[in-house]
Design a protein with these regions (language model features):
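TRNA-recognition modules of translation machinery and tRNA-sensing kinases, especially anticodon-binding
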Residues: 2-510
């Protein structure tokens, strides 16, 4: 992708230019084009690709109008700020100082292959954009502060990321089979969610994508939880913590989720005030109409300040943010099972396995790259034993490369240990006889230095810190298990049947 930048700047000085100051400025422009803007540019680069001041500088009393153009080297805005520093030194002898810089116009042109249906970002920085014959021109509205914040560079990278995402294979991740268990004994051909509803084990809750789980379903949840504790958490020495379930923007900004989480989160807003009189008419409206005055409530809330728990591990990281971990405390192994997670699934809701509110045991670990990989391998072995010998599932595992990992350059990062090829996610999938499809019901992710870097976590030895996580979703375990084994506990594997006991039928509806 070829990129060009063009910037028109207005430099305002403390006093009008004298003829001597004008001559000194012109000499400085010539020197900047020959030397200053070439610093750090690799040898052999075409000069047209390097930032330079073009056209004829215009002097208007205490104002200097300049045009900067560049390719990818010493980009136009970088050239501007290099020149600002240099001219301040040069014109000081003429008692001229820069007061401010206005950006008259800024244009970015990107030329290359754009995928069919490519959509230009809609952002307040972009006044106008045009994509014609493989050339995207963006007319920007930016201030000098925006340029110092590298807004043009970030816009270019954003466009490149959108192109990469569209050409990544037409889907969010790449999939490679690792293991398949082969067929196992099945006792069910029906949809387990429908069967649980018919038997009164679960009922739809008032909110979308939400279920009320009766005693029978919870017995199975707790049995799975016991298996996890006895076969995985305990033997691998994970310690329990409680992670927050209300997540502020700061956490998602550092974790990277702020790059794309918006269509899937439940947002959290706060009241503008707790003053009861401010809300009295809202309460009165309900008392009179029996309806909640939602439109008026929208006017009286602030935020959103963040969202409800989406991915369960990011809220852990402020606990170690900015810290240096002692060598002898590593690796750290923790888990959280304290509450629900929430994702807006839109039209993707199905059964208990794809819901907006779900229950998950989140397993998280961090340490050196080698320690992180070793724990992931131990988890893989534990899951394999549980799925094969205890749950007796028909399952398979696959290595996947989520788009966000490829996008952030995490795949193949070696960290000096030759283990970068292990970064990525392994999905575990169970066969669903009633649909003839596979359900992803478990995963293990090695995230490399993504989270430690985002939250500035270091190791005493100076070794790069890595982390991993694994979400154990109770709804998905239940959906996978019942789809194959059915709801009659007499057909269940011995360990599960023993831990569940006889399902409790507490309710009788007339």
């Amino acid at each position: 992708m070829q990129v060009r930048f063009r910037l028109e700047a207005v430099l305002r000085f403390s006093s009008p230019f004298t003829p001597e100051a004008e001559q000194a400025t012109l000499a400085l422009i010539d020197e900047a084009n020959r030397l200053l803007f070439m610093k750090g540019v690799p040898k052999g680069v075409d000069p047209s690709e390097v930032g330079r001041i073009t056209g004829i500088p215009q002097f208007r009393e205490n104002i200097l109008d300049l045009t900067f153009e560049s390719g990818p080297y010493t980009r136009a805005h970088d050239a501007l700020f290099r020149f600002r520093k240099q001219i301040a030194l040069t014109l000081g002898r003429y008692r001229l100082g820069i007061r401010d810089i206005d950006i008259g116009s800024y244009t970015v042109t990107m030329t290359g292959e754009f995928p069919s249906g490519f959509r230009v970002p809609r952002l307040p920085f972009i006044r106008h954009a045009d994509l014609t014959n493989g050339s995207l021109t963006m007319d920007l509205i930016v201030s000098s502060a925006d340029l110092e914040n590298r807004i043009p560079d970030r816009l270019v990278r954003l466009v490149e990321e959108k192109i990469e995402a569209a050409t990544y294979g037409g889907k969010g991740e790449h999939w490679e089979l690792i293991f398949e268990s082969g067929k196992k004994l099945r006792h069910n051909e029906g949809d387990p969610t429908r069967q649980m509803v018919e038997r009164g084990w679960i009922k739809h809750a008032p909110a979308r994508g939400q279920w009320i789980f009766g005693p029978q379903a919870v017995q199975l949840f707790r049995a799975f939880e016991t298996i996890v504790m006895e076969e995985i958490i305990g033997p691998l020495s994970f310690s329990e913590m409680i992670f927050p379930k209300m997540v502020p923007w700061e956490v998602w900004m550092r974790s990277g989720h702020a790059k794309g989480v918006y269509p899937e989160i439940y947002y959290i807003c706060t009241p503008k005030t707790r003053d009861a009189s401010y809300w009295e008419d809202i309460a009165d409206y309900f008392k009179v109409t029996g309806e909640v005055w939602v439109e008026e409530i929208r006017k009286r809330i602030d935020g959103p300040i963040g969202g409800m728990c989406y991915a369960q591990c990011p809220p852990f990281w402020p606990f170690v943010q900015g810290e240096t971990l002692a060598n002898d405390c590593l690796p750290i192994r923790v888990f959280d099972r304290s509450g629900t997670s929430h994702r807006y699934e839109s039209g993707g809701i199905h059964g208990i396995e794809r819901v907006d509110e779900f229950h998950r045991i989140e397993v998280l670990w961090l340490g050196t790259a080698g320690q992180t990989i070793e724990i992931a391998d131990q988890l893989h072995e534990s899951y394999r034993r549980v799925f094969e010998d205890i749950l007796e599932l028909e399952w398979r595992s696959a290595r996947v490369t989520p788009w966000f990992m490829a996008q952030e350059g995490m795949i193949g990062s070696e960290a000096g240990c030759g283990c970068g090829g292990r970064i990525g996610t392994t999905d575990y999938e169970a066969y669903l006889p009633y649909s003839g499809s596979w359900l992803e019901f478990q995963n293990v992710s090695i995230n490399g230095d993504k989270y430690p870097k985002g939250f500035n976590v270091k190791i005493q030895s100076g070794t790069e810190c890595w982390s991993g996580c694994s979400g154990i979703g109770l709804e998905r375990w239940t959906a996978a298990f019942l789809a194959q084994k059915g709801l009659d506990y007499g057909n269940w594997p011995e360990t599960v049947a023993r831990l569940v006991g006889e399902p409790k039928n507490l309710f009788k509806f007339l």
